[in-house]
Amino acid sequence: MTTSIDAQYEQYLNAGLTLDLTRGKPCSDQLDLSCALEDMIGGNFKTTDGIDARNYGGLLGIPEARALGGTLLDVDPKYIMAGGNSSLTLMYQFLVWRLKAWQANNPSQTFKFICVVPGYDRHFTICEHLGIEMLSVGFDNAGPNMTEIEALVRQDQNIKGIWCVPKHSNPTGHTYSEATVKRLANLPNLASKDFVLMWDNAYAAHDLDPQTMRHQTGQRSCRQGVL
């Protein structure tokens, strides 16, 4: 039996449409805004450490890009790695690397991640693809429900991390409070070992209100012995 929805679906399939519904992808007009950037450097492609940026570079990335990242994130550039234009690729590669280490000690164990919901579906797709079990935790006014998260981390040594979008979290728009950020930074101290915070600060520079809170950085938490 064919329903009207099935018929409508088949109609779209047969229309031969080639639509790109990728979220967050700039249009050509937006990309054209960056055309003048190459002209600004006047053909000088040498980085501050003397590498020709058109050639292969070091593993940590272009120094100028790392310095810019340090400014944007309020982190010492020596703690910054500048990759390609896909942060999601870096996150995936990092978790593949960590998962291999976890599995080396417990090859038959299923590892878990805390996922603050609603959240970014592609974070969750990475977990699904890697066979990482997802534990959903909701929000309160200050961000993720930290009481529930802390209890989970204390109880289960197979919980290895948490996904965080600390500012203007999509789709709810939550910005984590300073107290919540500090409690998140302390989670590795509550876990059995090797707990990671996947800190996807994608909207760090997207404040519409100039009074939006600046977070204490992970680097500062490290220096305080929290992480």
Question: What does each model-found stretch correspond to?
Answer:
Residues 1-60, 64-65, 70-71:
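N-terminal "arm"/small-domain region of PLP-dependent enzymes with the aminotransferase-like
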Residues 198-199:
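Generic enzyme active-site microenvironment
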Residues 227:
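PLP-dependent aminotransferase class I/II
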Residues 51-193, 204-224:
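Conserved core of the PLP fold type I
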